[in-house]
Amino acid sequence: MTQDEMKKAAGWAALKYVVPGTIVGVGTGSTVNHFIDALATMKDEIKGAVSSSVASTERLKGFGITVYDLNEIDALSVYVDGADEINGTRDMIKGGGAALTREKIVAAVADKFICIIDNTKTVDVLGTFPLPVEVIPMAREYVAREIRKLGGNPVWREGVVTDNGNHILDVKGMAITDAKGLEVQLNAIVGTVTNGLFAHRGADVVLIGTPDGVITQ
C-alpha cells in the first residue's frame, strides 16, 4: 500500500464519526482531501461543513457541500483533520500547509477531534518536522529572535502568506518534550498569532493508515 493509499484509507475511515444532520468541521491537507472525497458520498445526509482553509472550502463547494462561516454556528459535533507529526499522547504538530490558526480555531469549537494520518506521521518525540509559527508580518524578526532564546532555529517560509495575511516561521532544531508548555510560551511572544502545537487541544481519536489497514487510537 502506498503512502497515498494509506492516507485515503484513514480519510474514508473517518466517515463513521460524522453525525448525520450536523455541520462537519473539515481541516486541510492531502489526507483531508481524501476525507472530503468520502464526505461527498453522504453530502445529502449532512447539513454542511465549516472549513479551515480556502483550499478546503473550494474542494467542498466543488462537491456541492454547503460551507458555513464559523461565526454562523455555535457548535460542531466533529472536526476531521490531519497532522504533520503526532506523539503517543496525541500532541500534534500541524501547519505544514500554513492553515494552523484556522485549524486551531475550528478544533477548539468541535466536540470531538478526529485526526487522520498515515503511519509516517507517528513519532516518539515531536520536533523533527519543523514547528510552524504564524506571525504578524511586522513582528517576524522580533518573534524570530525570541524563539532563538528558547533554543529554536526559526526560518521564514518566504513567499507564503496565510489565509489571514500573515507570515510563517518554521522552527527547526527542537526536541519537544513539553508540548503544552512550549505551546503557551510561543503564544505569549508578542506578534505571534498562534503556533502549530496542538497539545492543549489534541486529538480525541487518531486514525492511522498502515499497510495492513487502519488502526484506531
Swiss-Prot record:
Pfam families: Rib_5-P_isom_A. It catalyses: aldehydo-D-ribose 5-phosphate = D-ribulose 5-phosphate. Substrate binds at T28, G29, S30, T31, D81, G82, A83, D84, K94, G95, G96, G97, K121. Pathway: Carbohydrate degradation; pentose phosphate pathway; D-ribose 5-phosphate from D-ribulose 5-phosphate (non-oxidative stage): step 1/1. One of its GO terms (cellular component) is cytosol. Keywords: Isomerase. One of its GO terms (molecular function) is ribose-5-phosphate isomerase activity. The active site is at E103 (proton acceptor). Its EC number is 5.3.1.6. It comes from the Bacteria. Belongs to the ribose 5-phosphate isomerase family. Homodimer. Catalyzes the reversible conversion of ribose-5-phosphate to ribulose 5-phosphate. This is Ribose-5-phosphate isomerase A. It comes from Aeromonas hydrophila subsp. hydrophila (strain ATCC 7966 / DSM 30187 / BCRC 13018 / CCUG 14551 / JCM 1027 / KCTC 2358 / NCIMB 9240 / NCTC 8049).
